[in-house]
């Protein structure tokens, strides 16, 4: 069967709503018919065999761009904020949609349309790609397919979160570990991830006597990887790059640490690519832990976020032409705390576990029992001494997202609708608290379509291999 015939077969659920011409060239004839039927193509992009999967992923991206929803970098918008050319009274939510990303993203886009929001990011971490069984092109297809389904137009910011160097693997074989990050960046950029958070903060060495010495390996390797990322840029795209100075859950970051990192990074990066833009943001630590601290009864301990530190370091970051500071691991905070991020002028906040919790809160009891039995059988080695069942299941249940991916998709439509509705309520709350409603006009002032044409051949290569990501942050 020719590639053209294969593509037509993959596109069959869309019927007469699109036209596929020689090239292949794609055009939309019936936008509503496309929106109503795109889910079937997304299913192929997620669960299809290799070639069908790649064809579906390419087709979705082409149709999204044709519909006006295009993968974009947030770089110029963040740099403008650093220059004081935009308000800084809102915080951009970066949302890790670990499970049912098509359904979750539909809820995000509905919330965005109803609030006229445009400053929001979809992301997935290196670790999450492993345990959720989602490579970059699959994740991007789910997000862009959701944009089509909801009739959303405008920039779609898709981000590689925590492209993190494993300290243990780096210690054994530095170049192999760095090559794994380089390979992942290449795969991600090909898929439309034009925002990448490089995380070499795992290599900060607190045994060194001075702060610049502690940060040296961090900023040097971040500069190396940022250089590699800049060399991957498609024509017309400036990738938004972030760095990180403090591992989530550790001590609060300080101004001397930020300055040591940025001075070192700018010196190292400038020696490699003198005329290229550097980082657009910096991730810091102000008190949270990824996924929250789990108490014996399974509830989440109250944590404090040092919003004064967040505000101060965002201000310092702007001196380095960045948009501000980024907070990780915040989705399990009490709802009344989210407005403080915007009030503190935080640039971006990363949210993940809270959305996963909503999914688990709505799963049927028999499926939950099956998941817990799976965790007992496959991940009992992760149970810590003295840990209750509630603590063990809460901390490990993310490991079930990949193995149960298809079962989540096959939940009854009423149950899926219930989960989507709960997610939408949460996204609406977050968009309001973070003050991103009404940001479309200001974002579109700085973010324009790149005009990038994506070749089908880029989606028909071999699948990326699996890797051990058990020691990486989410």
Where do the protein language model's features map onto the residues?
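Histidine/acidic-residue-rich catalytic or RNA/ligand-binding cores of hydrolases
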Residues: 169, 294-296, 334-344, 359-370
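Alpha/beta catalytic barrel-like cores
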Residues: 1-160, 166-177, 183-184, 193, ...
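Alpha/beta enzyme core
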Residues: 106-119, 137-141, 145-150, 172-320
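Glycine-rich beta-to-alpha transition loops that act as phosphate-gripper elements at the mouths
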Residues: 159-163, 324-333
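Short, surface-exposed connector motifs at secondary-structure boundaries
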Residues: 90-92, 317-324
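Glycine-rich phosphate-binding active-site loops on the catalytic face of alpha/beta enzymes
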Residues: 199-205, 344-363
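Conserved, mostly hydrophobic/aromatic
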Residues: 161, 241, 282, 328, ...
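Glycine-enriched alpha-helix->loop->beta-strand junction motifs that scaffold or abut catalytic
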Residues: 192, 278, 340-349
């Amino acid at each position: 069967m020719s590639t053209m015939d294969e593509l037509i077969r993959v596109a069959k659920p869309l019927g007469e709503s699109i036209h596929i011409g020689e090239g292949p060239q794609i055009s939309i004839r019936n936008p509503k018919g496309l929106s109503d039927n795109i889910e079937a193509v997304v299913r192929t992009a997620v669960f299809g065999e290799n070639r069908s999967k790649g064809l579906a992923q390419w087709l979705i991206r082409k149709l999204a761009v044709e519909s006006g929803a295009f993968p974009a970098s947030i770089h110029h918008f963040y740099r403008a904020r650093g220059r004081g050319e935009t308000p800084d009274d809102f915080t951009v939510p970066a949302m890790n949609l670990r499970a049912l990303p098509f359904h979750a993203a539909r809820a995000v886009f509905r919330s965005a349309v109803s609030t006229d929001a445009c400053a929001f990011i979809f992301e997935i971490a290196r670790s999450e790609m492993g345990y959720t069984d989602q490579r970059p092109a699959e994740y991007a297809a789910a997000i862009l397919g959701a944009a089509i389904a909801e009739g959303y137009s405008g920039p779609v910011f898709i981000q590689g979160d925590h492209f993190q160097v494993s300290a243990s693997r780096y210690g054994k074989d530095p170049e192999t570990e760095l090559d794994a990050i380089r390979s992942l960046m290449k795969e991600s950029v090909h898929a439309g991830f034009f925002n990448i958070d490089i995380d070499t903060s795992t290599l900060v060495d607190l045994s060194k006597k001075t702060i610049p010495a502690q940060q040296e390996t961090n900023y040097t390797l971040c500069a190396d990887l940022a250089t590699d990322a800049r060399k991957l840029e498609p024509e017309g795209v400036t990738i938004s790059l972030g760095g990180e100075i403090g591992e989530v859950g550790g001590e609060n970051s300080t101004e001397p640490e930020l300055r040591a990192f940025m001075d070192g990074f700018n010196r190292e990066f400038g020696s490699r690519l003198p005329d290229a833009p550097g980082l657009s943001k910096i991730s810091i630590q102000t008190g949270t832990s990824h996924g929250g601290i789990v108490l014996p009864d399974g509830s989440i301990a109250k944590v404090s976020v040092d919003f004064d530190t967040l505000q101060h370091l965002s201000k310092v970051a702007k001196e380095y032409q960045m948009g501000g500071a980024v907070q990780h691991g915040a989705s399990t905070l009490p709802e009344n705390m989210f407005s403080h991020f915007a009030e503190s002028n935080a640039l971006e906040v990363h949210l993940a576990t809270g959305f996963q919790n909503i999914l688990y809160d709505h799963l049927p009891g028999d499926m939950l029992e099956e998941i817990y039995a799976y965790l007992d059988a496959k991940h009992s080695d992760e149970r810590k001494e003295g840990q209750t069942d509630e603590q063990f299941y809460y901390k490990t249940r993310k490991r079930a997202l990949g193995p149960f991916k298809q079962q989540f998709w096959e939940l009854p439509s009423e149950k899926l609708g219930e989960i989507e509705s709960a997610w939408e309520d949460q996204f609406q709350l977050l968009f309001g608290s973070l003050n991103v409603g009404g940001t479309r006009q200001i974002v579109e002032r700085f973010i324009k379509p790149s005009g990038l044409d994506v070749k089908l051949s880029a989606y028909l290569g071999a699948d990326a291999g699996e890797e051990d990501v058990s020691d990486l942050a989410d």
